[in-house]
């Protein structure tokens, strides 16, 4: 039991350190309002466009929440590992994040790609209610 506990702690620490090294998971990166070229450059350096941090945010959610250019968001959604039904922080979908941010272009794109408009997050909150609660 003790060995299992330490193994879990060790693996968790490795995951945490790895996530912290991914530029695309750093809040400061998104606060700088990066261009599509900058994001592509970071990916070419080995930064994962689909990895999640410890809070289950990924580059797509971070880009949406920081109101980054829709060209960047569209590009990230197309990357391997980023499917429209991917569960993120609190099991929220990209559609919930985009609706809450008031990003109608991305909302339409996600619906066109098959995102479930009736999906509920881990709190049982549907897309429309989450969008309304976000203002």
Which residues fall in each region the model found?
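Ankyrin-repeat intra-repeat helix-capping/turn positions
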Residues: 34, 67-68, 102, 135
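Ankyrin-repeat helical core positions
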Residues: 30-31, 43-44, 64-65, 77-78, ...
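Ankyrin-repeat boundary/"N-cap" motif
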Residues: 21-30, 51-64, 85-97, 119-130
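Ankyrin repeat domain, specifically the short helix-to-loop turn at the C-terminus of the second helix
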Residues: 40-48, 74-83, 108-116
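Bacterial Sec-dependent N-terminal signal peptides
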Residues: 1-25
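Conserved ankyrin/ankyrin-like repeat signature
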Residues: 38, 68-72, 105-106
């Amino acid at each position: 039991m003790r060995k299992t506990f330490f193994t879990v702690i060790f693996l968790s620490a490795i995951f945490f350190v790895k996530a912290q090294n991914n530029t695309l998971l750093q809040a400061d990166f998104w606060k700088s309002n990066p261009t599509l070229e900058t994001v592509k450059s970071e990916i070419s350096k080995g930064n994962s466009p689909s990895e999640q941090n410890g809070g289950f945010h990924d580059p797509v959610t971070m880009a949406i929440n920081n109101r980054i250019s829709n060209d960047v968001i569209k590009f990230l959604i197309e990357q391997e590992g980023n499917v429209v039904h991917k569960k993120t922080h609190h099991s929220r979908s990209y559609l919930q994040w985009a609706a809450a941010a008031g990003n109608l272009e991305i909302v339409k794109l996600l619906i066109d790609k098959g995102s479930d408009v009736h999906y509920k997050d881990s709190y049982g909150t549907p897309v429309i209610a989450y969008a309304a609660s976000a203002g």
